[in-house]
Amino acid sequence: MEDFVRQCFNPMIVELAEKAMKEYGEDLKIETNKFAAICTHLEVCFMYSDFHFINEQGESIVVELDDPNALLKHRFEIIEGRDRTMAWTVVNSICNTTGAEKPKFLPDLYDYKENRFIEIGVTRREVHIYYLEKANKIKSENTHIHIFSFTGEEMATKADYTLDEESRARIKTRLFTIRQEMANRGLWDSFVSPKEAKKQLKKDLKSQELCAGLPTKVSRRTSPALRILEPMWMGSNRTAALRASFLKCPKK
């Protein structure tokens, strides 16, 4: 699974996931499914934010990266992907500026158009079950919840899906692609089932030495949302090598 993650996701997303797991004392060599889940969640959050801006009239617009209007205000503030200290600093700043109620748990995004925090969920289970779990944990009407599944289903607070249909379709397509690529490599069942995951981990550990010398193909493209986070954790020499838009899993 670890090899798949490094091949399938942008290196910047992988590094953010590594930092997140390290911050919580988790070993990605052992918890490979969690590693994959964190990378997937990060990518969905960045895709959610990509290309969405607010114009001078306060309207939400979708703008391609190379459009000169890209200097407009970003609609979403990205909180996910930052270390906890910085994330809470961003949340506090938003609350002080907008008057929003401070959430008890760190959300993933803030929507400047709707003036609300957003919690993004990506689930391998039924969307309504995961939605209820999120809602019971957060217990706040001020945090909007939006859940995506790998099967193309979604569920959001009061059926308010925030984004336009095309933007959500991009996210659903990406999740479906990840699922298919996992299935093609025999990883999907272990990703869904903890019991299968333990079996897969043993196989992964045995095959690591055999695969160590193999070349790895990784896309060097990234989303504009990720570029916002780059200065916090990447040197400019590495940043220059990464271009806009999202990667796709390499074919076998």
UniProtKB/Swiss-Prot annotation:
Protein name, per record: Protein PA-X
Function: Plays a major role in the shutoff of the host protein expression by cleaving mRNAs probably via an endonuclease activity. This host shutoff allows the virus to escape from the host antiviral response. Hijacks host RNA splicing machinery to selectively target host RNAs containing introns for destruction. This may explain the preferential degradation of RNAs that have undergone co- or post-transcriptional processing.
Residue numbers annotated as active site: E80, D108
Comment text on domains: The probable endonuclease active site in the N-terminus and the basic amino acid cluster in the C-terminus are important for the shutoff activity. The C-terminus acts as a nuclear localization signal. The C-terminus is recruited to host protein complexes involved in nuclear Pol II RNA processing.
Feature type site, description Important for efficient shutoff activity: L28, L65, K202, K203, K206
Record key words, sorted: Decay of host mRNAs by virus, Eukaryotic host gene expression shutoff by virus, Host cytoplasm, Host gene expression shutoff by virus, Host mRNA suppression by virus, Host nucleus, Host-virus interaction
InterPro entries documented for this protein: PA/PA-X, PA/PA-X_sf
Subcellular location: Host cytoplasm; Host nucleus
A Pfam family matched in the record: Flu_PA
Positions of the record's site feature: Important for efficient shutoff activity and nuclear localization: K195, K198, K199
BP GO terms, sorted: viral RNA genome replication; viral translational frameshifting
Keyword Secreted: no
Molecular function terms from GO: RNA binding
Gene source species: Influenza A virus (strain A/Memphis/101/1972 H3N2)
Main location, first listed in the record: host cell
Family statement: Belongs to the influenza viruses PA-X family.
Superkingdom of this protein's organism: Viruses
